């Protein structure tokens, strides 16, 4: 037996017999260990041992099945060592090879292969891979639609469908609709039966109460939830009015509104019929608020008005979206949609039958067939419609003494019926062991039904003598108490039966069970509070400087071409925090983690860190780039991006023009690539040869003329003709390999930066072509079409990886991929990203219980609106989607063993904090469901919860000065560190000192190898200690701007030994996005400088001049609106402005470049006599003018600076103005006599 010390609950789960047993095992509760131990005890039971092959163990993935088999094998081997001579146990190791430890699909495959004759399938059938299945479906659908068009007279309803839901130019929307519905219904035991039942629900008769339908009940339920959510805030409003001065006249109106609200809530609860509710909602009236006296408290007045506006918004929403029709009107709409939906259903069924026939002709099955064929073998329906096991199922009942299902929360209805058919439940001997955690059910998009788990969880007994028992495992053996406490703190507030589908309470919460020994090393720090990092991605005009803070300079923000994308900003913040984990803190301590293999604490490594993202699309590329720029090694298994890699695009373009050279874009891509290597001048010559022809025709004309590019064009055309001939007799994969060799492109990309990965991508493309031609399809044109379909149908795959996830790298992965894994340090990032609700806006929604939800369309009258069923399904999908998102958040947070760091970005921290504050002020310990349903991202759940924490003063204060927090303050065991950052905090990217960790690791290795030869050891140390003479100088840039130089010295004044850093690749904001969130201070400053550069100061019509700039498209409308004409006028009329107007020569926006000795910028570097390199200093002087024989310099500042704070301005810009003066004197050979800074924000002139 194992020597593990099991908890009471674990022991019960291991030893309980003769029942259906549901084990609800929370994250880190050791469910796999319990499952393995249960199996081992069953096969080694002294009184009633069973053979391992008499157990059916069902896992969720193949990897899990392999791991389970290995762990059981290891456990059996250990048991053999302790029980020498036991033939039975030794026999189990032999039987293990044929034991049914498998995924449900693998089990189904075994059932089909063993019983193929019962469903009349070819015994030699093969399973279609995704490639061939996609092609076969496409072919089937094309054939189906072609036949429909040929027999148009018999398919009038199809053309009604096409007019109503098709596109303007083609039928692709209808094809997509058929495919999506077909895929959706495959998770049902009998898809055609489900379709027929759901379509018939539209055959709704006039005179019936719509409130009695499933759709009506859902709408009443969700409406009640929205209305009850208004109760607390309306009561709060009445209380505020009573206690406020001058608002007495409001009270009667608010009381009346509140009474009407309560009546409406009561009607919803009592189940009044639909039409009565319709009448009441549409008769709900709001009186105008009376005028209040001048003594009214304005802040309270605005607050209660907002609450009343919210009430109005909800009532109006119910009128417009729910109760906008009476039952008979709804019945009329449903009757209108009935024939069209029946047509959709028929199309789906026809497609399914034709697709099945094509598969049968090829002796093939696809992945979905495995479950359905298995179900047909094991289940049958009697004359009363009851499902019962077949004789074959009875054989499996006899074979398996117990069925053990892992990750039960992710089962679907088909799988549930299959398990029931082979279990002994129906003969009074329940024998199914199910283990899982409904809080980790995150696969609804695969039609998983957590309701199956919940139904048993709510109905099974905790009584140990019950035939249907549940056992709860909530002790977490994975995470530190700091992590567990934080998870419990959040989810006890946000997760409920209505949002989350489970009430997270004292019974459900995690109990710390991980035994982390104290760290004895005083130079390290372990564990620690959960960190919440929020970065504000844009700063508006209302930025308030905290006391003692420095005024912002527009040059402290990135220039227009340095504006960081929001994802990039968060990624840089994360990169900086990762670097900090490797550096000593303010107390000189480094972060350490416990190494299970070593049995001791050690410094953190990159491989200890994971970055979890809700979605990897777009995010992983940006995060990978930022981490790489910081010299942090990273591995990201993105699962997409392969077709976007330049090397793959070039080869695909080459294949496209071999198939059809009359395609300009792919032809240009090939010509410009290293395969042909045309320059832009060459391409210009080709285009000018014949501007009206295709590029291919122009290229042919170029080849016959005597020009510089003719020879290159002729050579390429000869090769292209040869390749086109080869494509007629060569297979596609052979052609691709021939092209690699003949063009040398494979070798060329290998010589490029990151060449190993590029070559790996080209090998993948070759293998993809080979895989494609192993199907029944072939030909270059078909392969290109197939690739195009993969791109459009989200069939992209990940780019090749040359770094492995087992290397010492930071891993980037989706939360879904992290399920079942654990990591010492977890960064949960992108928490400010909006939830994806796109599925709610399709023309037809689908739901497992509610069926179809289409738009109502009358194309003849050009009327379209969401039908009532669609509104019901949309409401239900929203609740289920947010419930799943909440469970995904739980999965993410429970991956952390020792440290959890949560990050997110917000556009405006003050506005976001005010929104969170409104939620946090609820008096209930658990937030009301309607508040949780308002969430747009994870921060909308996390931040209101954290706001209530005793340690969250920073987050509460972020709502702004004068905002009172009246909600509860929770004294919880959890500990939180909150960091609010803005763009200035990440303006300078940190870089990881790569040699630091390497040296420490090698030194430690040498110490462990104490017996090594002393001479060798001395030589190794000598080599490690050697430093390149000019190592410090290798980091010096060849050029630097004055702005960067100013920032560098500013940082050096704040932190000792700071090094000058540079922003890495940044992302411009496209012009069309300027107006969406307003201009940043940096953008406004740029616009102001542009205007100041081009204004005619002698022309008093400044506004007119700005309008002309807009007309000439020198400025956008948004930029023009940001220009403060009065401030420019104030400058012109100031003392320095008038002097400038009198000057004969005025110069504006003057660029300069001057060389400086390196010691002047890097005084901390050593003096090296033979090192004479200089640095190029660049900058732009705003304005200077000449007076007699000298120069007067003016620099504008457009950013906010407090009035009268001239001294800090002088200190901050002294260095910058000094370099400007020096540059002007070198350029003009005249003395800069006076230097001024003009502050647009206050109109002050600061003499430097």
Curated annotation (Swiss-Prot):
Keywords on record: ATP-binding, DNA damage, DNA repair, DNA-binding, Exonuclease, Helicase, Hydrolase, Isomerase, Nuclease, Nucleotide-binding
EC number: 3.1.-.-, 5.6.2.4
Organism expressing this protein natively: Ruminiclostridium cellulolyticum (strain ATCC 35319 / DSM 5812 / JCM 6584 / H10)
The protein's assembly and partners: Heterodimer of AddA and AddB/RexB.
Domain UvrD-like helicase ATP-binding: residue ranges: 4-480
Residues the entry annotates as binding ATP: 25-32
Cofactor: Mg(2+)
Residue ranges occupied by any UvrD-like helicase C-terminal domain in the UniProt entry: 523-820
Protein's name in the database: ATP-dependent helicase/nuclease subunit A
GO cellular component term of the entry, any: cytosol
Keyword DNA damage included in the entry's annotation: yes
PANTHER family reported for this sequence: ATP-DEPENDENT HELICASE_NUCLEASE SUBUNIT A, UVRD / RECB / PCRA DNA HELICASE FAMILY MEMBER
Reported function: The heterodimer acts as both an ATP-dependent DNA helicase and an ATP-dependent, dual-direction single-stranded exonuclease. Recognizes the chi site generating a DNA molecule suitable for the initiation of homologous recombination. The AddA nuclease domain is required for chi fragment generation; this subunit has the helicase and 3' -> 5' nuclease activities.
Pfam families from the UniProt entry: PDDEXK_1, UvrD-helicase, UvrD_C
Catalytic activity, reaction form: Couples ATP hydrolysis with the unwinding of duplex DNA by translocating in the 3'-5' direction; ATP + H2O = ADP + phosphate + H(+)
